Amino acid sequence: MSRTSPHQHQPTGELSRRGLLKTAGGLTAALALGSASVATTADAAPATFTHPGMLHNAGDINRAKVRVAAGTDPWLSGWNRLTANSHSQSTWTPRPTATIIRGGDGQNYPQLYNDIHAAYQNALRWHVAGTAANGDCAVRILNAWSSTLTEITGNADRYLAAGLYGWQFANAAELMRGYAGFDLNRFKTMMLNVFYPLNDRFLREHNDACITNYWANWDLCNMASIMAIGILCDDGAKYDQAVNYFKNGGGNGQIRRAVPFLYPGVEGYDLGQWQESGRDQGHTVMGMGQMGALCEMAWNQG
């Protein structure tokens, strides 16, 4: 079994963003591209953004509704696990704060991610079952944070907070777009003023470290946040920023650095080696998940 650098692959024709970003289902598909096709600057943003169009589109939601209503497994079993989770209850009380700290003294970031999970899970319950109490709860959480949060700080881990929680928060908001009482404009302002500047700064400066100092998951969560914010705000420039970094960025989250080697012809498959494979399985799988989220959002935009 030979090891092949993707940089040695022969160039092929230019792919559309869907052709490249369907790597959520198979990362090595993108690695089969040659350097000539990837080095061009993408003009990837759709003329009109699809909503909902992040991790779930309208077809996904309808399919879940139909399968759950029919009592079909594994959909019903998954639904029952969702509804039994404490974060999925309409009685959830948000705990917004003006400053989120991750890394260093005074860390309080679990307040944010627990509320994000609750908003997202209540939003799913509202979409699938139509229960107004869950929709109201999701909006209550989103509005509480958009009226309160002004800063994410801490040591270098603040960039992880802005990235990880940025794309997750935007996904919850995307599901509640158009819901009565949801202050979408204020939520957009929070995402643009609190999350995006950290996402953008990390990809440009990498916390003033060598550009390859940080593992792939650091780049990827910030790329996913920028893409999600672009979709939420109908901002093509931000969407393109994420796609272009995926293709051409200098950090370890760029596709050729995130999966630096291919092992071709293993029982009929090309296997890819993840950039963090020598670290631990938790971070390795998380990085793949971050890239999967990025690619799924791009796929749902067409």
What are these regions (language model features)?
Residues 107-301:
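Aromatic-lined, polymer-binding surfaces characteristic
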Residues 22-25:
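Internal alpha-helical transmembrane segments of multi-pass membrane proteins, especially GPCRs
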Residues 15, 56-59, 70, 182:
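Short coil/turn linker and secondary-structure boundary residues
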Residues 50-53:
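Boundary/entry segment of secreted carbohydrate-active catalytic domains
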Residues 45-47:
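Boundary of Sec targeting at the N-terminus
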Residues 58-136:
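N-terminal carbohydrate-binding/catalytic regions of secreted carbohydrate-active enzymes
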Residues 1-16, 27-43:
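N-terminal secretory signal peptides
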